[in-house]
Amino acid sequence: YEIPFGDEIHLTIIAVLLTWFTWAALFTIVMNEFYKFVTLNNIVKFFSVPVLILDIVLFDIYATGIVGKNAFASGDSRLICLAIETVIALSLALSNILVGDKRLPTKREVLTLLGTLPFAILPIMPPYVPQALFGYLDQSVKIEDLTEAHRFVIYLGFIIPVLIFLYYKDKSYEVKRFAMIYLMVAMTWAFIEHYSFDTLSEPWSWPLHLCNTAMFIVPLCLIFRMNKLFTFCLFINVMGALLAMVLANTFDNAMETGSISYWINHYAAFFMPVLLVALKIFKRPGFKEWVWAVVSFAAYFFSMLFVNAWFSNYDAGVDFFFLNSDFIAEKLGNWAIHTRDITVSFTFRGLVFTFYPLYQTLFFIG
């Protein structure tokens, strides 16, 4: 991979910030079409519009940062897509301003805008931003094995939702629901940056890990008020994400894109369902809902058993929910590793399906 701007660090910083802020600008413009809040509208007016104008003025830097060093020389079709996207978004924002309330914000609204803007921008930060702006951390900094840095990151996973709860607990239901939709969809947008259109042609690369599914299920539950599906997130995703945070499976540098994406995913999967109940957006489920969640988990579990065995024929590294490797077993000791010695295999139409009945049964029961 060739760095678009080489040693010209200032251009890299401009391109990274433009891309990040453009994500936020596009997102707020879209949200403003569905939810009518004064603060959101002011963000579109005084943040999103200026950012999109900057995109046009600095289009060579903006486009090169996204498409690559030879974007203009190669005539990449993405340049046209970026230009169309920018013009449509800017036109949409300006049209709303022209037909809407043209008054200037009050002093109180300005203060609210300034206080809200950082929190509107941060959740949608592309995972590569820390690495692009600050580089790698020292390799001695490990966010795994419960090191000091790892514990700090875990503590943040508890502190952040508490702060969000304290801020929103006395707000109206509609404000709380909108804020949580905004937060969850923004984090999902940032999370899927890790994937590309090529991923669609490789099902074994799809985000089918248990915690990955939360990034798509929770927004659906929020937007379409899917109460039954939400119980799956609350009972299953939360516990799975907590275990994943403690048994962190990150091999990248702590500042690398993959690591940041990992924590965006698991923070959201861990605290968002709990936060939604605490804020009374969803009711606290009872025993009946718990039974439904267990049945849903069983369906997911056995589906992943089959999917792992099937897709391993195309990629030996397939390991959805860690059912296909010794990642969990080695954390528990030799006795757990040896449970994988018992295997059952069969061949169907040239494909080999391998299962670990003892290990996978104990995994399910546990």
Name each model feature, range by range.
Residues 37-51, 105-113, 173-184, 228-234, ...:
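Membrane-interfacial loop-to-transmembrane alpha-helix junctions, especially the N-terminal start
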Residues 63-76, 195-205, 224-228, 248-261:
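Membrane-interface helix caps and helix-loop-helix hairpins in membrane proteins
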Residues 251-301:
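A contiguous pocket-lining binding segment that forms or flanks enzyme active sites
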Residues 50-62, 117-127, 185-195, 237-249, ...:
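Aromatic-anchored segments of alpha-helical transmembrane domains
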Residues 150-156, 180, 199-211, 234:
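Structural signature of hydrophobic alpha-helical transmembrane segments
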Residues 18-30, 81-98, 116, 152-165, ...:
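Hydrophobic cores of alpha-helical transmembrane segments in multi-pass inner/ER membrane proteins
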Residues 9-16, 73-86, 136-156, 290-294, ...:
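Membrane-interface transmembrane-helix boundary segments in multi-pass integral membrane proteins
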Residues 4-10, 137-146, 163-175, 188-201, ...:
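Short juxtamembrane and helix-loop transition motifs at transmembrane-helix boundaries
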